[in-house]
A protein has these predicted regions:
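Catalytic cores of Mg2+-dependent Asp-rich isoprenoid enzymes
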Residues: 1-15, 19-181, 186-302
């Protein structure tokens, strides 16, 4: 299975800028799409064909644009997210407007093509607004509620892009995406703590007697924090496995792509285990070999 995403899939006529009305500091199309190769999970395998690749890249571009506005924008992030919300509304009404940010125009055209619920696109904005105001989550259920905005909409949009959406597939996809989000939170404990955010549930910190200050301390992690990460990894693995029937329910290129996402999740969790559940020594990254092994295993199952 090819796991390297393509470097560029701009349709003819799209630009590399930000449109005419974007606030200063909003990243352009080329900057966003140039980062695809560094992602944990395969965005668009070269085996998917140009039509599906273009659809996935449109979704990736929107998700990464919103994440960058919420995480890295140098100015007022809530105002930048408000701009993105307004830009999306404008694009949904006039998706061919050349004044739009190219990534917003691209995802609006896709939403019309696949008849996607625009609220799924807006959920990503809502999640990033929460990131500006909610520094932590008391319970695991609270964290799952956040994942319903930050991660699960992406899976549902991907299913729509594959013309494969059903209620059962939505449920499996939600499990997969929630697990992937938890894996990312485990990888990024130190980075999130530096940004003033704690995604590990407070009830779990208390259970494992982990002081929140430990999350941003210099490594290596102590035994209590390692125990907590081991617990979260096991929970994420269980949720990911519960969502795996999604792969078997799909056929053709959709099955290939979703197998890649699920395999990427298992490989990320493997990387945390290989690091002895220490999240403070730098975000553990999955090995390509592990990703291929997991992906192959998923694809050969009936």
């Amino acid at each position: 299975m090819t796991v390297s995403p393509p470097t560029d899939h701009r349709p003819a006529g799209t630009g590399t800028g930000t449109g005419t009305g974007a606030p200063s500091g909003v990243p352009g199309e080329a900057e966003i799409l140039g980062r695809m190769g560094g992602e944990n999970f395969p965005v668009a395998s070269a085996l998917l064909g140009s039509r599906l690749r273009a659809r996935l890249v449109a979704l990736y571009g929107w998700a990464r644009l919103i994440d960058q506005l919420g995480d890295d924008y140098p100015g007022d992030r809530l105002a930048a997210l408000d701009w993105a919300d307004a830009e999306l509304t404008r694009a949904l009404g006039h998706p061919t407007d050349v004044a739009l940010h190219p990534l917003v125009r691209r995802v609006a055209l896709l939403a019309a093509e696949i008849k996607a619920d625009p609220e799924l696109l807006r959920d990503l904005i809502r999640a990033n607004r929460l990131d500006q105001t909610a520094a932590n989550y008391a319970t695991f259920e609270d964290l799952v509620g956040y994942c319903r905005l930050s991660a699960n909409p992406v899976g549902r949009l991907v299913l729509a892009a594959f013309d494969a959406a059903t209620p059962q597939r939505h449920a499996w996809s939600d499990d997969v995406c929630t697990a992937l989000q938890i894996a990312e939170h485990c990888q990024d404990v130190a980075e999130d703590a530096a940004a003033g955010r704690i995604y590990l549930p407070a009830e779990d910190l208390e259970r494992f007697e982990v002081d929140p200050a430990e999350l941003g301390a210099p490594g290596p992690a102590g035994p209590r924090l390692r125990g907590l990460i081991c617990f979260e990894v096991a929970r994420a693995r269980r949720i990911l496995t519960e969502g795996q029937p999604l792969v078997r329910s799909l056929r053709g290129r959709g099955r290939l792509a979703v197998a890649g996402f699920v395999a990427g999740g298992h490989a990320a969790l493997d990387a945390l285990a290989d690091a002895r559940f220490d999240p403070l020594g730098g975000a553990p990254h999955p090995r390509t070999r592990r990703l291929v092994v997991h992906g192959g295993s998923l694809l050969v199952r009936p």
